[in-house]
Amino acid sequence: MSRVKRSVTAKKKRRKIFKLAKGFFGARSRLLRTATEAVNRALNYAFRDRRVRKREFRKLWIARINAASRAQGLTYSRLIDGLRKSHVEIDRKVLADIAVNDPRGFSEIVLLAKGETVS
């Protein structure tokens, strides 16, 4: 049976780890074991936080909508309920954007949620 030299495979593996660890501080970008641990941890955090990001943005949108709707004299939950009853299908992302960038348009949406006619 012939002998298998692993230098090509090992170098490829090391290069991959060091490429992922580029920009890390100190030994985390220079030593293989430390870099491997740092890369694995970073990838785990990235995986987790891609899911957390969705939650965080939804919380931010709700906070912005709530603040803008309370300024109009309506709570967030009553606003969402009113929009659902008046068959207005605007998602929270767009609603928060309207609340921040177009206060006049948002006040018209609040009137729709209250069940009043928009002039």
Swiss-Prot record:
Coiled coil: none annotated. GO terms for cellular component: ribonucleoprotein complex; ribosome. Keywords: Ribonucleoprotein, Ribosomal protein, RNA-binding, rRNA-binding. The keyword Isomerase does not apply. Gene3D superfamilies: 6.10.160.10, Ribosomal protein L20. Pfam families: Ribosomal_L20. GO terms for molecular function: rRNA binding; structural constituent of ribosome. Disulfide bonds: none annotated. GO terms for biological process: ribosomal large subunit assembly; translation. InterPro entries: Ribosomal_bL20, RIBOSOMAL_L20_CS, Ribosomal_protein_bL20_C. Binds directly to 23S ribosomal RNA and is necessary for the in vitro assembly process of the 50S ribosomal subunit. It is not involved in the protein synthesizing functions of that subunit. Belongs to the bacterial ribosomal protein bL20 family. HAMAP family: Ribosomal_bL20. This is Large ribosomal subunit protein bL20. It comes from Syntrophus aciditrophicus (strain SB). The gene is rplT.
